[in-house]
A protein has these predicted regions:
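Positively charged, amphipathic and often flexible ligand-engagement surfaces
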Residues: 80-83, 87, 101-103, 126-131, ...
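Active-site acidic/histidine proton-transfer and metal-coordination neighborhood
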Residues: 2-3, 96-232, 242
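Active-site glycine- and acidic-residue-rich loops that bind
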Residues: 59-61, 185-194, 238-250, 272-274, ...
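Flexible, acidic glycine-rich loops studded with aromatic residues
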Residues: 299, 304-400
Length: 400
């Protein structure tokens, strides 16, 4: 939904990756099931924005003319509109082991380019006039895969193909869509500073810009302008908090580097000010076996990164991993804590306060996709009711 009273043209939504379903049929059905309830709670008198999650399979089907026509009719009937797409997970995202497979295919793979193009075609077809679009995507690759010889340049070259496609869409339709790389712990782009370095040291290299110039039939200066217009960063507040970033400062650093933030994901992580033996059982309840729960420990020697929660717990039992823990597990933003387990909600509140003061991004998306694996005590109502509660919490903080 559009939020009035904030700097810029700001839209708030939730991401439908919370709903299980990989086929286009499943996704359409989930919208019919959940959107009316959420809209009635948070946007009864105005259109409800939707952050649409598409799998690779669904994106390929959804862009077909008959599917698009039916989807437009469905959105009209629901009183909803789509302004952003989550094209991060390509395959199954619920009910199976996801872990590091969520990053595949990564930006070394032509399948990622096609998935992004399919998603862009869908978004361009349903994006309301006068509203920009965004597509969030994997942060290059899982860290070990991103540092193989030649990987960075290959990912950059494939990203240039995506930028050229988005530039062509704008030329053809007048609709601007930006692709947004989403930094995540233990990935090729993990921190804001790594993201800025990738733009400055890889994407802006003459040979990389030259490939975009050739693809888009522009000169080098035109290629850089297209790059900055159609490629930016999706800042996930949970991810930034897990990295112990000064979120407000890093969002400012992106702006000073000339890197856009097409989307901010409003989310919170688990925080333990000091890990203790007494907390092990409570922490283990979040070891769901489905998602990767990267854990970063801040101790006397600085930050130590663990790819998954079991790795951090094993280190703790071995006498290591002493200090503050932050765990990549999206927890409800309306909860200040989860009993004896803390939350990084204070980091989220600092970003929301920043947004009240000045423009940060046009697209704000609540993204607690873990409802199905959270301990039952934190599922306070129906899924639709909990989603609505998260949207309402963020909306209140943004306009108060």
């Amino acid at each position: 939904m559009k939020l009035d009273g904030l700097p810029g043209d700001v839209h708030l939504t939730y991401c439908t990756n919370i709903h299980a379903g990989e086929s286009w049929y499943d996704i359409v059905a989930s919208l019919d099931l959940h959107v009316p309830l959420i809209k009635a709670a948070v946007a009864p008198d105005c259109p409800l924005g939707i952050g649409l999650r598409l799998s690779g399979e669904a994106a390929a089907r959804a862009r077909e003319p008959d599917a698009l026509a039916a989807f437009r009719e469905q959105l009209t009937r629901l009183g909803a509109y789509v302004f952003t797409i989550n094209a991060f997970p390509f395959g199954p995202f619920h009910g199976v082991r996801v872990k590091e497979d969520v990053f595949l295919p990564d930006w070394r793979d032509a399948a990622r380019v096609k998935f992004t193009a399919d998603s862009a075609a869908v978004l361009a077809a349903v994006l309301p006039e006068g509203v920009d679009g965004s597509i969030s995507t994997v942060p290059g690759a899982f860290k070990p895969n991103g540092f193989i010889d030649g990987a960075a340049d290959l990912m950059a070259s494939n990203l240039m193909l995506a930028v050229a496609d988005l530039a062509m869409i704008e030329l053809r339709t007048g609709k601007r869509i930006a692709l947004a790389l989403e930094p995540e712990p233990c990935c090729f782009l993990e921190t804001t500073q790594e993201s800025i370095a990738f733009f400055e040291n890889v994407l802006l290299k003459p040979e990389i810009l030259g490939s975009l110039a050739a693809e888009a039939n522009v000169n080098q200066a035109g290629a850089e302008a297209l790059l900055r217009r159609h490629l930016g960063i999706c800042y996930d507040v949970c991810h930034g908090a897990v990295e112990y970033e000064d979120l407000v400062a890093e969002l400012g650093n992106l702006r000073r580097a000339g890197i856009t933030v097409p989307k901010v994901q409003l989310s919170a992580a688990i925080r333990l000010p000091a890990m203790t033996t007494e907390l092990v059982d409570a922490v283990m309840r979040y070891n769901d076996g489905v998602y990767l729960h990267q854990t970063i420990v801040r101790g006397a020697g600085g930050l130590t990164r663990y790819t998954d929660l079991p790795d951090a717990l094993a280190a703790f039992r071995d006498g290591r991993a002493q200090g503050e823990w932050r765990i990549h597990c999206h927890v409800p933003v309306f909860l200040a804590d989860l009993g004896e387990i803390g939350s990084t909600r204070a980091d989220l509140e600092s970003v929301l306060a920043m947004m009240r003061r000045g423009y940060v991004s046009s697209h704000l998306e609540v993204e607690t996709y873990t409802w199905d694996v959270l301990p039952q005590q934190w599922r306070t109502g129906s899924k639709a009711a909990d989603i609505a509660r998260e949207i309402a919490f963020c909306a209140r903080r943004l306009v108060e």
